[in-house]
Amino acid sequence: HKNRFTICKLPRQSGKSTIMISYLLHYALFNPSVNIAILANKAATARDLLGRLQLAYENLPKWLQQGVMSWNKGSLELENGSKILASSTSASAVRGGSYNIIFLDEFAYVPSNVAEQFFSSVYPTISSGKSTKVIIVSTPHGMNMFYKLWTDAEEKRNSYIPIEVHWSEVPGRDEKWKKETIANTSEQQFQTEFECEFLGSV
């Protein structure tokens, strides 16, 4: 929460979406008039995340719920003035807006040219808001912008704080589970999606 720039390299099915949705919902409820962008490699994925956030909101006790001003597939606005937008990661997604949190989901799966255009277009928006948070979460997918940002964060060449989780930290995942998963998929797929290794190039 204290970090302005965070990058997370996480395995599949490790609860990353649930944790992020919970954090963003908490932030919107307890901070009035904030703008949050949920951006994913596909608009449908971002809308799905927003849908899950809306479901989490519905399951809150009534005393925690804010009044809802507008509620649709692409955005949510609360009575306290906080807004959450869901869109695909593109150069035009948040251009011209002012955001308190920009959450980039599965950033490694955003095509390299789009990822670069996004940052060159959006970084002025990020840097002008002195407290704007950028949270990048992804499973690796080749040597691309996510790879560069991650390795630079590890080497302290940028401002991102790197966070990673190993698949074995997820309850119920052991060597038996690993062997079964590899048998049902492939060694390479396991290395990328669960060991979170950067393989090949894109």
Predicted regions and their residues:
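Short, flexible loop motifs at catalytic/binding sites
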Residues: 1-202
